[in-house]
Design a protein with these regions (language model features):
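Short, low-complexity N-terminal intrinsically disordered segments enriched in polar/charged residues
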Residues: 27-30, 34-79, 83, 170-192
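Bacterial N-terminal signal peptides that target proteins for export
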Residues: 1-9
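Surface-exposed beta-loop interaction hotspot
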Residues: 166-203, 212-221
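Short beta-strand edge/turn micro-motifs at domain boundaries
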Residues: 152-181, 270-291
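C-terminal motif of bacterial Sec signal peptides marking the signal peptidase cleavage site
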Residues: 17-21
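Bacterial signal peptide processing site
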Residues: 22-26
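Coil residues (strongly favoring Ser/Thr
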Residues: 34, 43-46, 50-51, 59, ...
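Surface-exposed, charged secondary-structure patches
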Residues: 97-154, 215, 219-271
Length: 291
């Protein structure tokens, strides 16, 4: 993930540089000066942001080759795949097979549209059965990974299936199903309400909840303790994603267990929160929080 963070930081710097460069240009003639006074500032900003930078950014990113090492770790590949349009077209097996329930179709090269996944969000999410499965994030021996796009409102799941072929990750198939066909269906149904209902959140706390937080007096240490349901607002990890979730299946097998580890990961800031939920008397409860 460190290489991914560096890549995204550089990407942000390039975008900033282009935007500032465009805004600092001044009209050369006095006639342009008089016209500029009559043009609303919002209009000028819109032109700068919506036209030049986006095209220029696509060209800059596409001209930057992905390092070979990015094919070793799937996360590194996925960040490059999502941001680099040229690379993405090279790494999709066309015609791309799409399975939608009982029907099959194919997407041709000319009809493909760049898939950014969660790159335009501040964070993405992962679902595991337990903490031991976190080791899969750094596994360089994987040869098949599934990226799930979960629409909570539409109750749908779109799976993007990637396979490593001749040492290179490629998108080989898309499978669409309902959320009710997903092995995490019980947890997803619970989470949809949990993410938006503050009263339900408090009701879904164990008593107490185990918590692990960074030690404010030591950057290299963590402190452990407990909190109770009424203290949840003090420990809640910001705004929870409520409309669309992403989940990456690195090979973990879901055993219809009574426990789920829900992970929130920042795109480029190193932020990570782990929330462990467990079914107690048939109801999902938050039992552990690691920030």
């Amino acid at each position: 993930m460190r290489r991914s963070a560096v890549f995204l930081f550089c990407l942000a710097c390039v975008m900033l540089g282009i935007t500032v460069g465009c805004k600092d240009k001044k009209p050369e003639s006095s006639q342009s000066d008089s016209l500029a006074v009559d043009v609303p500032v919002d209009t000028v900003d819109t032109v700068v942001v919506d036209t030049v930078p986006e095209d220029a950014m696509d060209s800059l990113i596409s001209a930057t080759p992905m390092p070979q090492s990015a094919d070793e770790l799937f996360d590194d590949f996925l960040f490059n795949f999502s941001a680099n349009k040229k690379l993405q077209y090279e790494r999709v097996t066309f015609p791309l097979k799409v399975v939608d329930g009982d029907s099959e179709s194919f997407i041709q090269y000319k009809d493909w549209r760049q898939e950014h996944f969660f790159m335009k969000q501040e964070m993405y999410t992962l679902i595991f059965d337990d903490e031991s499965q976190l080791a899969l994030l750094s596994d360089t021996t994987l040869d098949s990974v599934v990226v799930e796009k979960i629409n909570l409102r539409a109750k749908s799941v779109e799976q993007h299936i990637f396979n490593r072929l001749d040492g290179k990750w490629k998108l080989t198939q898309i499978v669409r199903n309902t959320m009710f066909q997903n092995p995490n269906k019980s947890f997803l149904a619970f989470y949809e309400k949990f993410a938006t209902d503050s009263v339900f959140q408090v009701e879904s706390m164990a008593e107490p909840v185990s918590v692990t937080l960074p030690d404010p007096d030591d950057d290299f240490s963590m402190i452990e303790g407990d909190f109770y349901p009424e203290q949840w607002p003090e420990f809640k990890p910001g705004e929870l994603p409520s409309e669309e979730l992403y989940n990456i299946i690195y090979g973990q097998e879901y055993r219809q267990s009574r426990q789920k580890l829900f992970v929130l990961r920042g795109i480029s800031n190193g932020f990570q929160t782990e929330m462990t939920f467990r079914q107690i008397d048939g109801k999902w409860k938050l039992v552990k929080l690691v920030n």
